[in-house]
């Protein structure tokens, strides 16, 4: 069998994955086999958390709106506010409502009073 000279292909491949894992701690940034395993884990987590981030931000916006809107009245809540928004066909999404709730509560109170009529 003839000899195959691959040059620096393997070194280049290992260097590429070690650059990816250079910020990892311990053997996760030094040993090739553990680097590849941790790289797969990191990419899986990143893929999973891209969807989870959307979920978490939606929950945060809903919590912020609900916390502010409960100050309007005892029986008034987030779900009633959203229901009234849909009935009046106001196109305000949860992100915008949460920003209004944080920056200008009086504006959110005015919106809720207008749509309750």
Curated annotation (Swiss-Prot):
InterPro entries in the record: Ribosomal_bL20 (IPR005813), RIBOSOMAL_L20_CS (IPR049946), Ribosomal_protein_bL20_C (IPR035566)
Keywords, comma-separated and alphabetical: Chloroplast, Plastid, Ribonucleoprotein, Ribosomal protein, RNA-binding, rRNA-binding
Main localization of the protein described in the UniProt heading: plastid
Entry's Gene Ontology molecular function annotations: rRNA binding; structural constituent of ribosome
Domain of life, per lineage: Eukaryota
Entry's family note: Belongs to the bacterial ribosomal protein bL20 family.
Function (record text): Binds directly to 23S ribosomal RNA and is necessary for the in vitro assembly process of the 50S ribosomal subunit. It is not involved in the protein synthesizing functions of that subunit.
Protein name listed in UniProt: Large ribosomal subunit protein bL20c
Organism in which the protein naturally occurs: Gossypium hirsutum (Upland cotton)
Taxonomic lineage of the native organism: Eukaryota, Viridiplantae, Streptophyta, Embryophyta, Tracheophyta
Gene name as annotated: rpl20
